A protein has these predicted regions:
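Extended ligand-binding groove/face enriched in aromatic
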Residues: 138-151, 157, 167-298
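Active-site neighborhood of glycoside hydrolase catalytic domains
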Residues: 283-306, 323-360, 393-395, 399, ...
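Low-complexity, Ser/Thr/Pro/Gly-enriched N-terminal "stalk/linker" regions
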Residues: 40-155, 180-205, 240
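Long, well-ordered core segments of solenoidal/helical folds
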Residues: 108-139, 179-197, 244-261, 291-311, ...
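Well-ordered alpha-helical segments within folded domains of soluble proteins
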Residues: 105, 149-168, 218-234, 269-284, ...
């Protein structure tokens, strides 16, 4: 028995529940899919299909659950979309209003820009042209954009998003022209197909296979990337044609999904679909047409959302990057409706991933999956060397921005900073802009990079997006206050208040940052400076060179309200210290951090075969062995026996070991490295 049309409180929702061992993997197997095919696309090493390692398959089958819940079930009744938009507590600035200056963010953005401009539009559009029956002489791309890869077309969507964000941030005409050219090419293909708005680089037969439960590689995943890219081109690059093409695609999705029963659609959702819910909610938001939100509601995967709504971590065995985008979509629905189920599940999901499933870098997963119960990373880390899929870090950062906007809690920015500094800035190769698929935590691992024309992994795509919009989280604001979240050289223009502020810093090489008011109204306003959780109570602030009596509490904001004048300067000092961070279930396995920076032991990359440099992840058994020593603690604190190296910023050396090692930030480590150590 289920309840219908009854408003339920959080308290009623959280009643007891029971589980039976039939879940996503079993359901998808019965539906004609392999467990991995139903849950994710991430490690396809051939062009058409992927079978996960036996260990991952076994864990999928053992761990997934189908929830049986004491009534009322959270999603028993059909969803009804009722617009009741949330007013977020904090809002980000438009990309054009935050200008990056010298430092790691502007470098990464430039490398990424050059990577994108090095891929010709006719090559990107080739598969779309062929699918539409249009002539093309363009040379095909390889990897996941090869003509026989079932995920072909996804990177084109990522490219559109990257071009849109780059243009929004820089106003550069060349990058806008690239994005506009792709949109025009896609519109041409859509008109030629003339199929109710359908557009992709593969035929609708892929969706017929999805409908019949036959193996196919995530067609809605690819559609989402294209639709999201079109959305971004409209929102950030003022391309009206992009909205027209997107609306046509949404119409096709609406018609296709509307023809399925609720039960059948739930089975279809066992195959990875990216953030289809999110992009449809976004389209509803900008058009005011709730038709698209109702279409987005059809992508509510109840088997996954129900445990989260009941605050139960049943993530073991699930493919991480299948599910994080689904939660981002849930967060977006909460913002449009204030339906607490979607807000609660987004919050709980973030909490359980970041508190019980997170490595020191802020990343999560092994072999693309959560392979263990919460707080068992000591077991998971040893299963394979393919830790921390980069797409997952990117999408967790997207989710963080939603939650931070709702609450304004500094802890979200502590997490965001950790992922950005260690994971995201640590996986883009200087100059080439080539990026990795995984960030391995295996001792003696190395970073394996994509190539210019023959990879196009999912993580190549999310990386292209991310490094285009690195200015989007440094500052937020409410009606009265400017929030300084991250410490990078930059300028912000708060147009509504007539405020301009410049941040000068060489953080993290330096413990200081300086905020200079360049323009201010006569009325008072507030500046809130994040005091990171990693600093000490000895943090200090100065206003116009005079010490302030107040110190900020680590993990909060220092609030300064005054009638600011042009030339006012705030200097913030955040002492950094060296700390050890053990795994919860194995305290002898530890990572070391300096402030927010994860440190990595440095080992030479000697005699590593070239072909091992460009795989999706490090193949440890095929590489020459590296001897990573165990360490013996020589004091109560890590700083007692790991000391800075004079004259070498952010470089440290152990002392008193049988074999001492040098440590540098992981994001600067391009040899072989070790992050976690056996410490006695």
């Amino acid at each position: 028995m289920t309840t219908k049309n009854r408003k339920l409180s959080r308290r009623v929702f959280a009643k007891g529940l029971a589980m039976t061992p039939l879940g996503l993997a079993a359901a998808s197997s019965a539906w004609g899919q392999s467990a991995a095919g139903a849950q994710g696309n991430a490690t396809a090493s051939n062009q058409t299909a992927w079978t996960p390692p036996a260990d991952a398959r076994k864990l999928d089958m053992e761990a997934d659950r189908r929830f049986v819940v004491a009534e009322p079930e959270p999603f028993a009744a059909p969803l009804v979309f009722t617009r009741n938009e949330l007013r977020p507590r904090l809002r980000p600035f438009a990309l054009r209003d935050v200008t990056l200056e010298s430092g790691p963010l502007v470098d990464a953005r430039a490398w990424n820009r050059n990577f994108l401009l090095g891929i010709a539009n006719d090559r990107l559009l080739r598969n779309f042209m062929v699918n539409a029956g249009l002539p093309t002489n363009a040379q095909p791309l390889g990897g996941w954009e090869a003509p026989n890869c079932e995920l072909r077309g996804h990177f084109v969507g990522h490219t559109l998003s990257a071009c849109a964000h780059l243009y929004g941030a820089t106003g550069e005409a060349e990058i806008k022209a690239k994005g506009d050219g792709i949109v025009a090419g896609l519109a041409h293909c859509q008109r030629k197909l003339n199929d109710n708005g359908y557009l992709s680089a593969f035929p609708t037969e892929f969706f017929d296979r999805l409908d019949r439960g036959q193996p196919v590689w995530a067609p809605f995943y690819t559609l989402h990337k294209i639709m999201a890219g079109l959305y971004d081109m409209h929102e950030h690059a003022d391309n009206q044609q992009a909205l027209e093409v997107l609306t046509g695609m949404a119409g096709w999705v609406d018609a296709w999904t509307a023809s399925k029963s609720e039960e059948h659609m739930q089975q279809i959702l066992n195959v990875e679909y990216g953030g289809m819910n999110e992009v449809l909610y976004n389209l509803a938001a900008i058009t005011g047409n709730d038709r698209w939100a109702r279409t987005g509601d059809r992508f509510t995967k109840k088997i996954f959302f129900t445990p989260l709504a009941l605050r139960s971590d049943q993530l073991k065995g699930m493919h991480m990057n299948t599910h994080v985008p689904e939660v981002i979509g849930a967060a977006r629905r909460y913002e449009l409706t204030q339906d607490f189920r979607f807000g609660d599940m987004s919050q709980f999901f973030f909490d359980t991933v970041t508190q019980a499933r997170m490595y020191a870098t802020g990343g999560s997963s092994n072999n693309e999956h959560w392979l263990v119960d919460p707080d068992h990373l000591g077991t998971e880390i040893a299963i394979s060397a393919h830790h921390q899929e980069c797409c997952c870090a990117y999408n967790m950062m997207k989710l963080t921005r939603h939650l931070y906007g709702w609450q304004g809690d500094a802890r979200y920015m502590d997490y965001y900073e950790r992922v950005l500094l260690n994971h995201r800035l640590g996986v883009i190769e200087p100059e080439s802009g080539h990026t990795t698929y995984f960030l391995s935590m295996a001792p003696g691992a190395w970073k394996t990079l994509c190539t210019q024309f023959d990879s196009f992994w999912c993580c190549t795509g999310t990386g292209a997006e991310e490094y285009a919009k690195l200015n989007n989280t440094i500052y937020y604001h409410d009606n009265d206050a400017l929030y300084v979240n991250l410490f990078f050289a930059s300028r912000v223009h708060w147009r509504e208040r007539g405020v301009r502020v410049r941040q000068r810093t060489s953080f993290p090489e330096s413990e200081q940052t300086e905020l200079i008011v360049e323009e201010s109204p006569a009325e008072p306003w507030t500046m809130r400076l994040r005091i990171p959780a990693w600093t000490t109570a000895a943090n200090a602030a100065r206003l116009n060179s005079k010490p302030l009596d107040v110190a900020g509490t680590p993990g909060s904001y220092l609030t300064l309200t005054r009638r600011w004048k042009q030339g006012d300067r705030v200097e913030l000092t955040m002492p950094m210290r060296l700390t050890a961070e053990p795994l919860r279930d194995d305290p002898t396995r530890q990572a070391f951090l300096y402030g927010p920076l994860v440190l990595a032991g440095q080992f030479p990359k000697v005699a590593l075969p070239e072909h091992l440099e460009h795989l999706q992840g490090p193949e440890m058994a095929a590489a020459p062995p590296v001897e990573v020593p165990a360490l013996k603690a020589r004091g109560a604190e890590a700083a007692d026996w790991i000391k800075p190296v004079a004259g070498e910023p952010l470089t440290f050396r152990t002392s008193g070991q049988q074999r001492d090692v040098t440590l540098k930030p992981l994001n600067q480590s391009w040899q072989r490295f070790a992050v976690y150590w056996d410490v006695t």
